[in-house]
Amino acid sequence: MFDLSNKTVFITGIGSGIGLATAQVALKIGATVYGTVFSEEQSETITGYIPSECIYKVDVKNSDEITFAVDDAAKCSGKLDGIVAVAGILSLQEFTKTDDAIWHNVIDTNLSGSFYSARAAIPHLQKQAAASIVFVSSQIGLVGHPLGAAYAASKAGINGLTKSTAVELAPNSIRVNAVAPGPVVSDMTAKARADEKRYNSLLADIPMGRFGQPEEIATIINFLLSEASSFITGQVIVADGGFTAH
């Protein structure tokens, strides 16, 4: 198993799903973890895993809030070795019914929030001999999906952000990668899983015949944070049970 001993990692969206699983795996392999939630209720839920002083209630659409949280975490820990931008939202509706408010909320949360998080972290990451940024994309950022224009655009944007930033930061020994999950068992997919017809339709498109588990995606993310992936940068790693392979 790869190791994050003596590493400090900041993770957005640790209140549930992939973010929570990423924090749990990171803690298990030795990391000190700081992270963001969007509600007090989420904060209370995860205090059993992470001390309350390491949890920040943040709106990732607000660059000032995320910058303060990252700076404060780096100050408290004395350093920052990696950041993972997980926080995101899913909104599905017809293209012509995607109004300005929906569009901006999805783009600002998923894409701008990821950008703000990385931008806040880079000055701290540059102080380390080696550091890592991991974004969370989606298979929907790689293939078409009906009703998902805003979400697909936000995730495709993350793919471009990953590659451009990786090339720019490579001379600073900062690696930048993304993970693109397929459907995962989480709050985000709860509605789809509750609809038997829709759920079975989704399963039919996944050669492995199941949704992924948050821990499976979290393991890939932590691999990318670790020195076990020291020659990997600029990659969008797809974990979708074979969906995009056919």
Describe the residue ranges of each PLM region.
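Conserved glycine-rich cofactor-binding loop
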Residues: G15-G17
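Active-site helix of classical SDR
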Residues: A118, S154, T162
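Residue(s) in the substrate-gating loop at a strand-loop-helix junction
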Residues: S138
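Short C-terminal tail/terminal secondary-structure segment
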Residues: V143, N222, T233-H246
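Short, small/polar-rich loop/turn modules that mediate ligand/substrate recognition or access, typified
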Residues: V84, A170, R175, I232-G234
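Alpha-helical segment proximal to the catalytic Tyr-Lys
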Residues: P123, V167-P171, S230
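Substrate-binding pocket helix/loop in short-chain dehydrogenase/reductase
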Residues: E94-F95, D99-I107, L202
